[in-house]
Amino acid sequence: AGKCTNFFKNISVAEFYLEATPQIQEGDELLITGETTGAYETVAHNMHDAKGLPQTIIEKGNYFAIKTDKIIRRGDRIFILKPNDDTNSNL
């Protein structure tokens, strides 16, 4: 998981700090949530590091930016959506 640290409205780019998840990879499904934002799903693509360089993997403890179709607010949380691998589920 991570947290939004900035949003650049003129280019619709959100900057995040990855603080709990070991890494985010290109193609990961992401969920961004916030009190005003609600729940917004997107896919990790065209990620850039703090220096503005394109990256396919962002490691824990780093800042990164992604383009979004929605306004993201400082403090919004980002999570990776992964399928539930619980094969013992009795649903």
Residue ranges and their predicted role:
Residues A1-L91:
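Beta-strand/loop-dominated core regions that host nucleotide or nucleotide-derived cofactor-binding catalytic loops
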